[in-house]
């Protein structure tokens, strides 16, 4: 008899994401496009289970306050669940590297050869993966997220962190 893994509770998910407008830096159309796609993809498919909160679904407000990343987690009816403040220090170098390579990527797609674009994109994805793993580590014991959810959240954190 084979064992099947337990099915994830479909209530352990985000149904809405809000980015704090005061936290969002000026950005160009490429960054705005990344943000819109990340929010759409995140809401479409995610695993998000705050420790000890029971099931959701949840809404998430993300902000930068001081030198901290704030995750304000609420139920769908806006009842508060928990607010987590995470230091931005572990993300600073990763976000800086991510945006440097994103700038190179956006320039390359206009003029470079397909091989050059692919090489830059592989580097971009590698840095993005590093940021996603760092976020999963920082959320460990607070909120359970799968890797794809962490990737989309890292994109949103990067948008907030980017100051144009």
Curated annotation (Swiss-Prot):
InterPro entries registered for this protein in UniProt: UCP032146
Domain of life: Bacteria
Bridged cysteine pairs (disulfide): none
Family, similarity comment: Belongs to the UPF0262 family.
Protein name: UPF0262 protein Nham_0287
Organism annotation: Nitrobacter hamburgensis (strain DSM 10229 / NCIMB 13809 / X14)
Native organism taxonomy: Bacteria, Pseudomonadati, Pseudomonadota, Alphaproteobacteria, Hyphomicrobiales
